[in-house]
Amino acid sequence: MTIHICTAPCCWGVDDVNNPFLPPWQRVLDEAAKAGYRGIELGPYGFLPLDAGILEPALSKTDLQVVAGTIFDDLVSPANLPELLRQTHGICTLLKQLPPMKQQAGQRFAGPYLVIIDWGHDARDYAAGHSDRAPRLDGARWSAMMTHIRAIAEVAWHTYGIRAVIHPHAGGHIEFADELARLVDDIPHEVAGLCLDTGHLYYAGMDPVASLRTYAHRLDYLHFKDIDPTVFDQVLNEHIRFFAACARGVMCPIGRGVIDYPALHSLVQELGYHGCITVEQERDPRDAAASLDDVAASRAYLANIGF
């Protein structure tokens, strides 16, 4: 088992580049390195500089490599497709200008990856974690989303050689078990893989261990996070947006929550997964003073159980 443990700017509350409380990007890189990570995601489009001449020296200074960039946007609306493709070209151009990640032995596709996440729908945002009441897309709108995902993935791969991976996410139109199964049926593995996230699987009512086992044949990239069960129970009983729940502390350092990480370690070994795992812990950026301690604690816990 060859694993490269990475982190992401969301651990510092970076999910919306327009949030006025975001920490400086240089601080995020510095603290990621201090916590023992050697890989980091770009975060939302435009948080880290899109100019490789600025970003590459900062990465070199902190001994970090970029493991992924992310499309975190409305994948459903046809009118948004030009923006999705603009971001795809921008992210992939930057990724190709940065030093490449070393491919791990046994890894299916070398990083960096392009992570694709649907987001930006109020009705689904307020229904995060509630499969019973979350409105589903009709056939035409689902087909449009699949077409847009294919377009993004094909540009990433055929133009830049970057593997696209689809990330089911709380509050988006790919969240619950039925949507994940439908996605896998509609998007073949040669077009895009999966980035499964233990925290989002649990939030959506799925068992992370069982889900990773079920979709191991499609799994190219992993996200690890943990959930505070007390806060989770509270927010599920409120009318609340997903990131408002994160601001309440629903995500916690790995090993302090409800997810069974020793079981996940055993499963990762059993499956022979090789490659990258990115640690995440969404929060309000106004609480980023605790980020260094939290990401360091998550890294130490994972190392202690064998990752």
Model-derived regions, located:
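Acidic-and-aromatic substrate-binding clefts and catalytic sites of carbohydrate-active enzymes
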Residues: 16-21, 39-54, 74-80, 124, ...
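Conserved, mostly hydrophobic/aromatic
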Residues: 7, 32, 40, 59, ...
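Acidic (Asp/Glu)-rich catalytic clusters
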Residues: 1-2, 29-34, 49-68, 89-111, ...
